[in-house]
Every structure is written in structure tokens, then in C-alpha cells.
């Protein structure tokens, strides 16, 4: 009898629990305040994310760490910002923090603020080639530093631990 092509066997749960795990979730915010249809879709999205994370925790172990891209504040400040800007994301992480997950900031404040500034400058456009080159050079430098900061933090996760990383962009490797 021939073997079925494309069949992937399900890994044993105990094997998964011994490994490092990083769960990436797209941090979708409410870009259309007051639009009830969009808010309904957001609620569905975040409810689905929470359910999927619950299922992962049942089989692969609890989430030890929670990171949110763009957040350099400690949890008390970050949670207030999330409450104002993305209550669905806050709801998803708040229950996990209360049950023992450790929220950790993923960004360095100075680095992140410089990234915002260089991004804004780049969006203005350029008349001179020199200004463009200076901006590109500084932007690349700050992006490289940021990537190292995030990479080092994520590499601190130990075998058997799990982390949730709420990302705003798809630029992480």
C-alpha cells in the first residue's frame, strides 16, 4: 500500500511542552472608532485569538511571558494605554497576567522613540540626496539596534517556556 503524501503526524504534547515556544499574534486595533461593524469584527477576532491561546496552553503549557510590539512601558502604564486604544488586546492578555504570565516590555524607550522620529522624517520626502542618505543611514542603524534588542529578549526564553508576542508588523524574523 502506498504512503499518503503530505500527511504530517501530530507531535506528542509532552514533546511540545519541553521546547521553547513563541506565539505570534497580529495586534489589530480599532482603526475606525464608532464603526460598529468593525468593532464587531474586532471582538470576534480577539475572542478567537483568546480561544486559540487557551487551547495552546492546555496542550503545550502556560504562557510565561507576554510582549507587545511598540510598548516600552511597564505593565501598569501599558495596560492603561491598551485600555484606551485596544481594549480587546488588553482583555486577551489581562486574564493571562492575572493567572501568572509575566508581561515584559519588548522595546527600549529611547530606541523606539528614535524609530518613530526617523520614520516620520522619511515619510516627508526629500529634496536633497544628502538629507535622504543621512535619514536612510540613521533609520537603518536604529532598525538594526531595535532588531538586536527584540532578538536578545526573545532569545532569553528558556527551553520549556512559552511567550506571546503581539506584533504590529510582519517585519520580524
Model-derived regions, located:
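Compositional signal for N-terminal targeting/processing segments
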Residues: 1-173
Amino acid at each position: 500500500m502506498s504512503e499518503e503524501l503530505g500527511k504530517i503526524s501530530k507531535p506528542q504534547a509532552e514533546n511540545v511542552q519541553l521546547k521553547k515556544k513563541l506565539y505570534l499574534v497580529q495586534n489589530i486595533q480599532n482603526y475606525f472608532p464608532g464603526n460598529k461593524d468593525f468593532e464587531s469584527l474586532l471582538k470576534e477576532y480577539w475572542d478567537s485569538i483568546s480561544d486559540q491561546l487557551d487551547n495552546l496552553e492546555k496542550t503545550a503549557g502556560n504562557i510565561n511571558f507576554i510582549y507587545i510590539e511598540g510598548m516600552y512601558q511597564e505593565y501598569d502604564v501599558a495596560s492603561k494605554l491598551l485600555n484606551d486604544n485596544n481594549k480587546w488586546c488588553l482583555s486577551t492578555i489581562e486574564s493571562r497576567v492575572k493567572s501568572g504570565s509575566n508581561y515584559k516590555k519588548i522595546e527600549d524607550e529611547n530606541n523606539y522613540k528614535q524609530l518613530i522620529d526617523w520614520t516620520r522624517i522619511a515619510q516627508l520626502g526629500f529634496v536633497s540626496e544628502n538629507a535622504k542618505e543621512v535619514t536612510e543611514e540613521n533609520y537603518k542603524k536604529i532598525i538594526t539596534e531595535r532588531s538586536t534588542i527584540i532578538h536578545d529578549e526573545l532569545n532569553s526564553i528558556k527551553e520549556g517556556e512559552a511567550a506571546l508576542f503581539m506584533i504590529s508588523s510582519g517585519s520580524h524574523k
